[in-house]
């Protein structure tokens, strides 16, 4: 059975003071116990990784893991501004987001680069969270599943059997940061299409890979989303900045 996974993506938010309050509040909320068979992680900006690692350890937060928002496609070398997966591993990261739509749009990242990043993450014994999704224009033209399944197929072509150690996050671009959200059934339909695309390669891999939903997940829609058979949790953006909302989603 696939575990339900909730990952908070702070994007370019946070501060030393706010991070302390966030972890303290989440620790207090998790003390009363969490639903069994679930996993949780938070991905702060790079400069806060050490602080958050120390805070998580200091509060004995066994339920919460540390993740990162990106990693370089290269192992080391003359790549100014890049952060290697091996460096993230040293901070205690267990998962790394790759291919987020904001990276695809703002930094022109293509599927081949994203697959290279995923390989770097895997080679350093962490879990890549590979993001896929369609724009509003692509959905309105009836090409949503075609676009997303093409993105998945390109990852399959590079990662092959190693996909079993990855997570996929479906993030409809039109729903990110807009307050819009795909209905639970629309999200389920896409998650099912992704799993069928994976099954064309390997049915066992398809049955084991967790597929998260990442489009404006909030406390008031998390229960319905997480009840869907092919939705295995959420990649949570804006709502993860509120420790109360993050806790509510984790317990949904």
Curated annotation (Swiss-Prot):
Gene Ontology CC annotation, any one: cytosol
Pathway: Carbohydrate biosynthesis; gluconeogenesis; Carbohydrate degradation; glycolysis; D-glyceraldehyde 3-phosphate from glycerone phosphate: step 1/1
Gene3D superfamilies, per database record: Aldolase class I (3.20.20.70)
Protein name per its UniProtKB record: Triosephosphate isomerase
Assembly information from the UniProt record: Homodimer.
Keyword Nucleotide-binding among record annotations: no
GO BP annotation list: gluconeogenesis; glyceraldehyde-3-phosphate biosynthetic process; glycerol catabolic process; glycolytic process
Location of the active site: 100 (electrophile), 171 (proton acceptor)
Annotated binding of substrate, by residue: 9-11, 177, 216, 237-238
Pfam (any one): TIM
Family: Belongs to the triosephosphate isomerase family.
Species name: Polynucleobacter necessarius subsp. necessarius (strain STIR1)
E.C. designation(s): 5.3.1.1
Higher taxonomy: Bacteria, Pseudomonadati, Pseudomonadota, Betaproteobacteria, Burkholderiales
PANTHER family: TRIOSEPHOSPHATE ISOMERASE
Signal peptide: none
Segments forming a coiled coil: none
MF GO annotations: triose-phosphate isomerase activity
Cellular localisation: Cytoplasm
Keywords carried by this UniProt record: Cytoplasm, Gluconeogenesis, Glycolysis, Isomerase
Function per UniProt: Involved in the gluconeogenesis. Catalyzes stereospecifically the conversion of dihydroxyacetone phosphate (DHAP) to D-glyceraldehyde-3-phosphate (G3P).
Recorded catalytic activity of this chain's protein: D-glyceraldehyde 3-phosphate = dihydroxyacetone phosphate
Major subcellular site: cytoplasm
């Amino acid at each position: 059975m696939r575990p339900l996974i909730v990952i908070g993506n702070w994007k370019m938010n946070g501060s030393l003071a706010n991070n302390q309050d966030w972890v303290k509040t989440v620790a207090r909320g998790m003390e009363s116990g969490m639903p069994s068979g679930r996993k949780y992680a938070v991905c702060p900006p790079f400069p806060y990784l050490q602080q958050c690692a120390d805070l998580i350890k200091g509060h004995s937060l066994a339920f919460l893991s540390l993740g990162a928002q990106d990693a370089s496609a290269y192992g080391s070398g003359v790549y100014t501004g890049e952060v290697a997966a091996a460096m993230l591993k040293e901070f205690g990261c267990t998962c790394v987001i790759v291919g987020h739509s904001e990276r695809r749009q703002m930094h022109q990242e293509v599927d081949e680069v994203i697959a290279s990043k995923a390989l770097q993450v895997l080679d350093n014994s962490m879990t890549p969270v590979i993001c896929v999704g369609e724009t509003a224009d692509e959905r309105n033209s009836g090409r949503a599943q075609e676009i997303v399944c093409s993105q998945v197929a390109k990852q399959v072509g590079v990662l092959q059997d190693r996909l079993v150690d990855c997570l996929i996050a479906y993030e409809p671009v039109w729903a990110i940061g807009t307050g819009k959200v795909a209905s639970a059934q629309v999200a389920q339909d896409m998650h099912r299409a992704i799993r069928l695309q994976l099954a064309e390669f390997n049915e066992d891999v398809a049955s084991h890979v967790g597929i998260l939903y990442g489009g404006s997940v909030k406390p008031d829609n998390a229960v319905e989303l997480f009840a869907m058979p092919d939705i295995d949790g959420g990649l949570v953006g804006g709502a993860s900045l509120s420790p109360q909302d993050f806790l509510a989603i984790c317990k949904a």
